[in-house]
Each structure stands twice: as structure tokens, then as C-alpha cells.
Amino acid sequence: MRLSVIIPCYNEAASLLRVIDSVRAAPGPEREIIVIDDGSTDGTADLLREQVDGKLARVIYHERNQGKGAALRSGFAAARHEIVIVQDADLEYDPADYPAMIQPILDDQADVVFDSRFMGHRPHRVLYFWHRMGNGLLTFLSNMFTNLNLTDMETGYKAFRREVIQSIEIEENRFGFEPEITAKLARGRYRIYEVGIGYFGRTYQEGKKIGWRDGFRAIWCILKYNLRP
């Protein structure tokens, strides 16, 4: 099986080329790389046009910033290979974890694999207490409605069989994608596995974008997508 690596980015000029190089160098099967620039204003789009466009499977440009969910929607639609994996453009997740992430799919045990930043033995950067508590609360609430036992619903690393992710309509434009896709996967009764990975988190000074407003939106999305008929 081959990989489609989807890289949504917004104002990631400082790290994007390193991420692309890391994805290319990572162990694992043949892959295509699809980058979606979501209306960046820091020169990311110019960087892509000058140094990247034409060297990857696809580079997609959004004229205005719409959010991570919108960027992923564009990327998923463009994917052509059997396994689709999300790679954030900020170096918080290490492409060296690809083999572990996709192995349950290769073994025909899973249709979807979530990573977990809170299980396993890989390095994990120590950061914000309240961010961790909020993540735990959102995962707990999501699990209550989905009847799953995930340890890290809000994680950015997810791998899918292509036919699974392309069959699901993604409605959320921002970080509400995580609880939305979790609810829809649970309703679809897909086989979901979880794998512990390394996590090299950023501070807000280093460019981390998710905030408390996204947390409240996540609660709304948990209710919306689990309770809606």
C-alpha cells in the first residue's frame, strides 16, 4: 500500500521545508505529498511557488484563510493512494512514526489509526498543564457520546484508508474537524486503533495556533455531530 501525506499549512514558512524534507526521508512505503496553503500571509505561498510547486504530487492554494478542516477537505479530495495520513506543518509530529501509524492498516486490523501523545514510550515535550486538562476533558466528553475509549481525540496525527476518509463529508472548517471526524467514524463502526507516538509540541510564542475558543467549539461539535440524527 502507498501513502498520501496531506500537509495543511497556515503561516508555516519557518518550518514547512523541513517538514517536507522529513516526510520524504521518513521510512515506509512510497508516498505522494499534497500541501495545502490555507491563505498564508507570512510568505508561505511564495515559498511554495518558488521552491516546492512542481516537485510534489500537488500543491493547493486557498485564496483566503478558512481553517484546518477546510484545508484537509481539499487535501483528502486530492489523495490518490491507499492510505491517507495527516501531517501538520509545524514539526510537532515526527514522520519517523509513519510505520507504527500505518501498521494496523497494513495488517488489515484497522480502517483508521489515531496517534496518542499520552501513551507509549516515545519522547513527549512537557508543556501546558491546562491545555492537557482541556484535552483530557474533550476526549472524555467525546468518548461518552461515541462509546470509544480513545486517550487522545484531539491529536493531529490520523491515518485512514482512503475510501473511508473520502466517503465522509467534512463540514467543519477549523479545529472542529477532530471531534467531527471522531463522531462520524464511530457512527460508521469503522475499526479504530490507537498508537503511541512522540510529540514535540510548540509554545504559543513558537507558533501554536489552537486556543480556548477552539476548545468551546470542540464541545459544540461533540454535541452536534453525536446527537444529530
Language-model region placement:
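Conserved donor nucleotide-binding strand/loop of the catalytic core
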Residues: R31-I34, A45-A78
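Cell-envelope/extracellular polymer assembly enzymes that use nucleotide-activated donors
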Residues: R2-S4, E32, E180
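A conserved acidic beta->alpha catalytic loop
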Residues: D37-D46, L91
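N-proximal low-complexity "stem/linker" segments adjacent to membrane-targeting elements
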Residues: M1-S22
